[in-house]
From Swiss-Prot:
It comes from Enterococcus faecalis (strain ATCC 700802 / V583). Belongs to the class I-like SAM-binding methyltransferase superfamily. TrmB family. This is tRNA (guanine-N(7)-)-methyltransferase. GO terms for molecular function: tRNA (guanine(46)-N7)-methyltransferase activity. The lineage of its organism: Bacteria, Bacillati, Bacillota, Bacilli, Lactobacillales. One of its GO terms (cellular component) is tRNA methyltransferase complex. The active site is at 118. The gene is trmB. It catalyses: guanosine(46) in tRNA + S-adenosyl-L-methionine = N(7)-methylguanosine(46) in tRNA + S-adenosyl-L-homocysteine. PANTHER family: 3-DEOXY-D-MANNO-OCTULOSONIC-ACID TRANSFERASE/TRNA GUANINE-N 7 - -METHYLTRANSFERASE (PTHR23417), PENTACOTRIPEPTIDE-REPEAT REGION OF PRORP DOMAIN-CONTAINING PROTEIN (PTHR23417:SF14). Residues 124-129 are annotated as: Interaction with RNA. Signal peptide: none annotated. Keywords: Methyltransferase, S-adenosyl-L-methionine, Transferase, tRNA processing. Catalyzes the formation of N(7)-methylguanine at position 46 (m7G46) in tRNA.
Length: 214
């Protein structure tokens, strides 16, 4: 998700180190210590303006959430939500999703959310897709054995690619929704993108895939 540059975003986020983690590599293997409890850790890669991860954290205080995004201005919008209504179980990281092993220890994360990731439709950009095998290999390292990825998109091509990528990697496809908003799925929290696309009548796809413990 791209947004207009927000003047002063860096200075704004620096004022709230209790929410936006500075030097996240020093918390590798110690995220539960950072949260002050032993609750499960769920992360969202590409958390955008933060609606999904914020509402999840609000609905599930028994789980620790971490929203990850590289874009400074957009992460500052997610921070707005925490400043207005603080939650003790949500942290924000401005880091690259390709380098997660620098910030999380092996088997430290319980679940990964991928919501409306960039589809990178051109074949030459396949390696940039967050469901490409190299990203899955990184995800598998930081996830606990039998850890899961929950993936949502409006892009049918990316969805079909991701189902294939999960299967080729050896993951178990637990559940699939080909039209999420017209299904019996309960508790769905919409992202900003999801609300925009669904209001146009676009179908939303969802899958839950699990790594197989080795």
């Amino acid at each position: 998700m791209r947004v207009r540059n927000r003047p002063g975003a860096a200075e704004y986020m620096a004022k709230y180190p209790q929410y936006v983690v500075e030097g996240p590599e020093k918390w590798q293997g110690k995220w539960q210590e950072r949260f002050g409890n032993n609750h499960p850790i769920h992360i969202e890669i590409g958390s955008g303006k933060g609606r999904f991860i914020y509402e999840m954290a609000k609905a599930h205080p028994e789980i620790n959430y971490i929203g990850i995004d590289m874009q400074l201005s957009i992460l500052s919008i997610a921070l707005d939500k925490l400043v207005a209504d603080p939650l003790p179980n949500l942290q924000l990281l401005r880091v690259d999703g390709e380098a997660l092993t620098e910030y999380f220890a092996e088997n430290e994360v319980d679940l990964i959310y991928l919501n409306f990731s960039d589809p990178w439709p051109k074949k030459k950009h396949e390696k940039r897709r967050l469901t490409y095998k190299n990203f899955l290999a990184t995800d598998e390292i930081i996830l606990k054995p039998n850890g899961e990825i929950h993936f949502k998109t409006d892009n049918q091509g990316l969805f079909e690619y991701s189902l294939s990528s999960f299967s080729k990697y050896g993951m178990i496809i637990e559940r699939v929704w080909l039209d999420l908003h017209n299904s019996e799925f309960e508790g769905n929290i919409m992202t900003e993108y999801e609300e925009k696309f669904s209001s146009r009548g676009q179908r939303i796809y969802r899958v839950e895939a699990r790594f197989v413990a080795k």
